[in-house]
Amino acid sequence: MNQTWRTHLQSKLQQLHEREQYRNLHVTEQAEETWLIRDEKRMLNLASNNYLGLAGDERLKEAAIACTRKYGTGATASRLVVGNYSLYEEVERSICDWKGTEKALVVNSGYTANIGVISSLVSRHDIVFSDKLNHASIVDGIILSGAEHKRYGHNDLDHLEKLLKTASPEKRKLIVTDTVFSMDGDTAYLRELVELKEKYGAILIVDEAHASGIYGIGGAGLSHIEDLAQKIDIHMGTFSKALGCYGAYLTGDAIYIEYLHNMMRSFIFTTALPPGTLGAVQKAIEIVQEDHKRRENLIANGEYFRSKLRDAGFNIGNSSTHIVPIVVGSNENALRFSKRLQEAGIAAIAIRPPTVPINSSRIRFAVTSQHTIADLKWAIDRIIHIAKEEELFV
């Protein structure tokens, strides 16, 4: 290996160790279950995105197997070549019916959706206004686009309006936000964002990754709770979280989607999703609309878990969903807390910069519809006990 490169990479890795930001891969089995196996130890799973417990659902498995047997294991090409199976059009029609939109585009992941949609729609001549706590894929899409990037304080609508008011009237404007923020568990003020985008002639993109399948009518997303869906220009959502599958979608007015499938590089220059994945996705979309009980259980479990941790004195920020952080400050605190929790049989992972701002390292808990109150109480008792021993109330 080239010695200059070796020295450079070793130096960068050493810096990560010194900042306690080095990350390891841990062998995990049965992550689709309420109890998983991590490093050969059985733990209560409070770390996954399998919010409705569908990743292990037999109906999804059977749908995936049936489509794999019929169409094979791979798409064989990009969608614009010969990879556009009829399954794609079926899934996209289902998304439009579910979301009440004109047209949809299925893509390979939430990350490729966000970097693709933003970098396709705007360029160095435009401005993007982005919440400070938006997902990294949104930030990367803005960087890739070359557009002017204006970050407003988290959920700070006054700051956003000030930025919109002072922006050049010559430039096209795009506002983008998560609906449920993945590391904080709070939600965007969608009604006010719609008002601002209309007032200042912007378009609005929302990332429903952690809301799709859970909130709104039939689990269509947070934007459907307040009947705002038709006023939002483009919705992005994933199949990899509440729907228990893989992939993502973009949906909105037909002209947006037509433009994206012609211009979005992360869609054009990649092989399509496997047919088995699409079969599972189609079944998952059907299930989440019909199975109200799973969604109700998830929301109730989130309320229970949040209230108990808040009452115990933990800093859980403004979480109002199934994602519940305990903010502990330093990287060292988060790593120590995570280690003790895993030793006690709780799969809970330390989240550190650059994923979250400096000095806001945390344990990110994610409850699911499949957890019982007994599971959560068992975990809460251990969380409180360990935090007291380690003096980790912040």
Curated annotation (Swiss-Prot):
PROSITE patterns in alphabetical order: AA_TRANSFER_CLASS_2
Amino-acid positions noted as binding substrate in the UniProt annotation, renumbered to this chain: 23, 135, 355
Pfam families per record: Aminotran_1_2 (PF00155)
Pathway per the UniProt entry: Cofactor biosynthesis; biotin biosynthesis
Catalytic activity: 6-carboxyhexanoyl-[ACP] + L-alanine + H(+) = (8S)-8-amino-7-oxononanoate + holo-[ACP] + CO2
Cofactor list: pyridoxal 5'-phosphate
Entry's Gene Ontology molecular function annotations: 8-amino-7-oxononanoate synthase activity; pyridoxal phosphate binding
GO biological process: biotin biosynthetic process
Assigned protein family: Belongs to the class-II pyridoxal-phosphate-dependent aminotransferase family. BioF subfamily.
Functional summary from the UniProt entry: Catalyzes the decarboxylative condensation of pimeloyl-[acyl-carrier protein] and L-alanine to produce 8-amino-7-oxononanoate (AON), [acyl-carrier protein], and carbon dioxide.
Protein's name according to its UniProt entry: Putative 8-amino-7-oxononanoate synthase
Originating species: Bacillus cereus (strain AH187)
